[in-house]
Amino acid sequence: MKTNARTVALATLMKVINQGSYSNISLNHALKAAKLPGEESRLATNLVYGTIQYQLYLEYQLKDLVKARLREPYIKPLLLMSAYQIFFLDKVPNRAVLDEANKLAKAYGRPKSSGYRLVNGILHSLLRRGEVLPEKDAPDYLSVKCSMPLWLSDYFVANWGKSRAEKIMASFNSKAKNEIRISALADEKRVVRDLDRAHFAPQESPLASRSYALSRGGIVMTDFFKDGEVTVQDEAASLVAEAFDFKGNEQALDACSAPGGKTIQIAEQLPDGQVTALDIHEKKLRLVKENAARMRVADRVKVKALDARKAREYFSRQEFDKILIDAPCSGLGLLRRKPEIRYTKTAEDISHLAEIQLDILNEVSGLLKKGGELVYSTCSISVEENEENVRKFLAAHPDFALKPFETAKISAPKGMLKILPDSYNSDGFFIAKFTTRG
């Protein structure tokens, strides 16, 4: 069967659903290999992310129609992908969905397999019956409607109330923006003008400076990206480095740096300083170095393979003017870009990660100079990983205090900022800024 959007999407979904692969990595590899034209590439991307985002909802639609065990590995992903098109892609006729599903089933099925008849029968039944949902007062109504595991749906409701929780979950099921940040070393006005001429139609972020949403993908294949004028970075993530007050000659530490987006953003502000980038994995630090070279700040970045929880075994106390702890987290703010997280993470994972984050905070904070600045951030919106960790850290370190901060477009008068995904249609993020007392 000829390679097209649906073959690429199905192959990717088989890896994600059956093997637990990361959707973004698997899809990027598949798209590079397939070299699809723009429209086909966009459809493949939509099919992969949409199917995973709505997987729980789609499984609920299919569960009463699947009477036999789905033995062949392509059948479940194909049914889910087809159901996604039926319920969410109005521009794709149902007849086309059925025809393409039959072609894929015959192409992927074993010789003499009747899998395609099974797929065809289930999809016809789905079309006849239509959508089903739990009763509105049922405990799992929001879970199914918003395609979130019940524990996570309940968690959002418990923390933000039913109305806001539903908006947050709906935002997580929307399409992620194609966001870039223009290097501080590049002429912003010229780059914006050139991006517009290249038909990327950049729209300025209301949240972060030098951040823009593009009307289409493919920026990484252009000279804008290759020459280090822009990098791919969500607007909420771009806010983290903006929380610092740089003079330009500081010694900075990025304690959890890979893949290096924030390391580079810090380095751009240090013409006479340096940022030391840590990561526990040597392989990931190679990516940091590659990105620093591409963005023309390699001379300002030094890397070290080290577990941040052992930082004081290697560095001297009060060695750094600025410290960033962009801590490993549950990724609950990234459910739009990494939709499978909702199905793989648990409440226990959040608790475990919160402990690791606090360990890093406790360890690395001892490396901050008196009067220096420490920024703690996560790409999670959980209370345990954010506000609760801040409370615990301050209770254990009376020599530290939260420090109000203001970026070019937003302020945090209490020293903490939580960006919920429905506020700006961005990733969810948390930032807290500390300084030492006295």
Segments and roles (model prediction):
Residues M1-G438:
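S-adenosylmethionine
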